[in-house]
């Protein structure tokens, strides 16, 4: 451990972030604005009527003051807490308080990010090991064909809210703020509309504050896991600390030393020695991939289980973390089915006297469109039935024909855009057929006409709208190379923005 003092040492100037007085200052919104904390500008707007969309930190201060008043917290005889303060506006107040807490608790971490970015901007520019979410798909294409084993892991979240507060305790050395946070979480959780005691992440309406709690937990977990991974790899990452701070994973904390208590750190490094271990995380899930034997993957699996269980008090069943061979397993990843296949390439070798054939087997990543899940999503969105037969979609009476057509065309283009990286795009023709015929049936239903009569009257205009694909756009931008480009994979940078919800792979596409 003596060779890593700088890694575990916590900056003493950051140990006493006293946030409690900031909660009651009405000028806090100006400080937040000056330091770039207004990513969601609606949080900081004042004097707005629609508080479901606009929040005021002045109102946050007043609500916290009322929450602390004794006559609003009544302790009943059986020990349960009743809070008539919330009343019929419990949803509204909890949302306002949640947004206010999110802005305040992000202040010290955002200041660290800005200072670290200014201090290490040159290192970030020179670092070859930084990765962002936009590089996930090219990473799969470049690296997965050279790997053998893969484990797809759902990152468990702390069941009890107290664990999330304890995670923040190592960052915020302010007992008053943590005490207020603990009270707020219990009040907010009681007013939350779900009966289950867990936090459902990555929903469209989820609060900024709960996402912040989740990110702090993931930062803590990855600080420990990736530190071990980097020290055990032959190709150690020299910029992991900068990488964490760049994406809101701010500092490594001294508490992770407890993981190695009573254990020789050099033994741990030799135990997990793996030159080709890759780690990818995306929206609550992670992928571990390796070129080594499945025995080493099993070691990493049980290390993760023990880390979650003993360090974060989160139970994770080892049997739910499967280790699969890439050649026999299809990875369901952000709306794609990906696997590694052997492709044979026959080369004829000619000499002066003989000729012979050489058969070369090469691994190649295949990404296919999940046609059945897509049809299921279309069925849930009322574009077709469960068997994939197009049906008319109910529309508003005041919708014009052009608005209806534009909506269907936009969905069709989003699908083509999102699956442009697929190696086999022919299955998308069926999806486009369903959308086109559903559009025609919707228009025919609106005009109280038959599909055949409406198509005859409309002519080829509708078909021209649906046939405009990436190939036509590329032909305008790259007239000489458009054919070669469109035949290959095209990974667009806004793919994660199109599919912003994991779990319903195509749900967000069909709602736009």
From Swiss-Prot:
Q: Which GO terms describe its biological process?
A: mRNA processing; RNA splicing; tRNA processing
**Any Pfam family hit:** Intron_maturas2
- What GO molecular function terms would the record report? RNA binding
* Keyword tags: Chloroplast, mRNA processing, Plastid, RNA-binding, tRNA processing
UniProt main location, coarse: plastid
Query: Which subcellular locations apply to this protein?
Result: Plastid, Chloroplast
GO cellular component labels: chloroplast
List the InterPro entries hit by this protein, alphabetically.
Answer: Domain_X, Maturase_MatK, Maturase_MatK_N
The record describes the protein's role as:
Usually encoded in the trnK tRNA gene intron. Probably assists in splicing its own and other chloroplast group II introns.
Q: What family does this chain come from, according to its entry? A: Belongs to the intron maturase 2 family. MatK subfamily.
Name of the protein described by the UniProt record? Maturase K
Specify the species. Answer: Oenothera biennis
């Amino acid at each position: 451990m003596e060779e890593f003092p700088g890694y575990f040492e916590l900056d003493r100037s950051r140990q006493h972030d006293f946030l409690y007085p900031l909660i009651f200052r009405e000028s806090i919104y100006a400080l937040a604005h000056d330091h770039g904390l207004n990513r969601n500008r609606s949080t900081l707007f004042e004097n707005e009527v629609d508080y479901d969309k606009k929040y005021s930190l002045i109102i946050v201060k007043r609500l916290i003051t009322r929450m602390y008043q004794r006559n609003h917290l009544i302790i009943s005889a059986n020990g349960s807490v009743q809070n008539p303060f919330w009343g019929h506006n419990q949803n509204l107040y909890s949302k306002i308080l949640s947004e206010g807490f999110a802005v305040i608790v992000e202040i010290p971490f955002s200041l660290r990010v800005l200072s670290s970015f200014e201090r290490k901007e040159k290192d970030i520019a020179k670092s070859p090991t930084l990765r962002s979410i936009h590089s996930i798909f090219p990473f799969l294409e470049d690296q997965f064909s050279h790997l053998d084993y893969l484990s797809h892991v759902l990152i468990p979240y702390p069941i009890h809210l107290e664990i999330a507060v304890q995670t923040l305790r190592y960052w915020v050395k302010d007992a008053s703020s943590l005490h207020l946070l603990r009270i707020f979480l219990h009040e907010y959780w009681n007013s939350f509309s779900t009966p289950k005691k867990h936090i459902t992440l990555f929903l469209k309406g989820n609060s900024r504050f709960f996402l912040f709690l989740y990110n702090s937990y993931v930062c803590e977990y990855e600080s420990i896991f990736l530190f071990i991974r980097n020290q055990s790899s032959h190709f150690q990452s020299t910029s992991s600390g900068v990488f964490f701070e760049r994406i809101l994973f701010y500092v490594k904390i001294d508490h992770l030393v407890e993981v190695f208590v009573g254990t020789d750190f050099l033994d741990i490094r030799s135990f997990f020695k793996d030159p080709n271990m890759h780690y990818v995380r995306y929206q609550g899930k992670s992928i571990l991939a390796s070129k080594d034997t499945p025995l080493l993957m099993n070691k990493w699996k049980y290390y993760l289980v023990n880390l979650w269980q003993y360090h974060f008090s989160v139970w994770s069943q080892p049997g739910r973390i499967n280790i699969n061979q890439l050649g026999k397993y299809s990875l369901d990843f952000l709306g794609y089915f990906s696997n590694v296949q052997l492709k044979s390439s026959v080369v004829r070798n000619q000499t002066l006297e003989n000729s012979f054939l050489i058969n070369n087997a090469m691994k190649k990543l295949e990404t296919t469109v999940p046609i059945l899940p897509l049809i299921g999503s279309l069925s849930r969105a009322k574009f077709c039935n469960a068997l994939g037969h197009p049906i008319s979609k109910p529309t508003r009476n005041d919708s014009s024909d052009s608005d209806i057509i534009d909506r269907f065309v936009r969905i069709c283009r989003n699908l083509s855009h999102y699956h442009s990286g697929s190696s086999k795009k022919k299955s998308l023709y069926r999806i486009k057929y369903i959308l086109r015929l559903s559009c025609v049936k919707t228009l025919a239903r609106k005009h109280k006409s038959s599909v055949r009569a409406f198509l005859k009257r409309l002519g080829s205009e509708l078909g021209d709208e649906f046939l405009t694909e990436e190939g036509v756009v590329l032909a305008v931008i790259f007239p000489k190379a458009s054919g070669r480009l469109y035949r290959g994979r095209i990974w667009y940078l806004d793919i994660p923005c199109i599919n912003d919800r994991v779990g319903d792979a195509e749900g967000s596409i069909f709602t736009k």
